[in-house]
Amino acid sequence: MTSKLPSILSATEEDIQLLLAAQCHIGTKNCDKQMEPYVWKRRADGIHILNIGKTWEKLVLAARIIAAVENPNDICVISARPYGHRAVLKFAANTGAQAIAGRFTPGSFTNYITRSFKEPRIIIVTDPRVDHQAIREASYVNIPVIALCDTDAPLQFVDVAIPTNNKTRHSIGLIWWLLAREVLRLRGTIPRTPDGWNVMVDMFFYRDPEEVEKQQQEEAAAKAAAAAGAEEAPAGLSEWDVSSAPQAGSINPALVSGEGALDWSADNAGPSDWAADTTTAAGWGAETTGTGGWD
């Protein structure tokens, strides 16, 4: 199929490989009547296959619409689907848009009394089925809507539909990453080169909180084990090492003063030979040798 885009906006081989690897072309078994122009064929198992060429054309069209908005803060990106929470937050952080990740508060576009009231010039939603409340309120106040649409998505009140798989974490993250990159390229923020943007597509993928917590615990345990190993005493030295203690039968160093004389004010070390007979002084000058009995 011949692309209607200028050569500079045409998809590269790497972009097509990314779209196929993320399974952005895999649709559902159901197909809405208005989504039929974007369907390439239907597999034997009933799954509809989307046309990747039309996906890229609509992606570039949406990027050119977004880049035409002067104030980036007038763009609102919405995702009530959990797989799109991280993607819309990263998109908003890189392009300056407002992000609503999670439940959309009813009245955010129509009730000016609410704290979450917004007046965007354009909104981008991840799934028209899940984000139907935001699309309906946008239709009340004439806000254009760009949506990531699967084959079973209703296109009512949707102005620009990007045909893609909006059910998996990789396809959602990749489309938001490509959209953010194309917007920055059209604004002139980054060059149109393969290595012009240093943000990896992995940063837009959803991560399970339990997996993140488990990974953090493993990293903390590894750091604790490394710190404990560094604090261990060197080999050959331990608290049970008695090589530095005085040998049996020698004079206690605590009794010896600086001049080499015995210091009797120090604690008595006691006899060195515990197997010898005890000798005590019985009188003023006489010495008696104690015996083992009373006689």
From Swiss-Prot:
GO terms for biological process: ribosomal small subunit assembly; translation. CDD domains: RPS2. Gene3D superfamilies: Glucose-6-phosphate isomerase like protein, domain 1. Residues 222-236, 273-289 have a biased composition (Low complexity). Residues 222-244, 262-295 are annotated as: Disordered. It is found in: Cytoplasm. Keywords: Cytoplasm, Ribonucleoprotein, Ribosomal protein. One of its GO terms (cellular component) is cytosolic small ribosomal subunit. The keyword 4Fe-4S does not apply. PROSITE patterns: RIBOSOMAL_S2_2 (PS00963). One of its GO terms (molecular function) is structural constituent of ribosome. PANTHER family: 40S RIBOSOMAL PROTEIN SA. Belongs to the universal ribosomal protein uS2 family. Component of the small ribosomal subunit. Mature ribosomes consist of a small (40S) and a large (60S) subunit. The 40S subunit contains about 33 different proteins and 1 molecule of RNA (18S). The 60S subunit contains about 49 different proteins and 3 molecules of RNA (25S, 5.8S and 5S). Interacts with RPS21. Required for the assembly and/or stability of the 40S ribosomal subunit. Required for the processing of the 20S rRNA-precursor to mature 18S rRNA in a late step of the maturation of 40S ribosomal subunits. NCBIfam families: uS2_euk_arch (TIGR01012). This is Small ribosomal subunit protein uS2. It comes from Coprinopsis cinerea (strain Okayama-7 / 130 / ATCC MYA-4618 / FGSC 9003) (Inky cap fungus). The gene is RPS0.
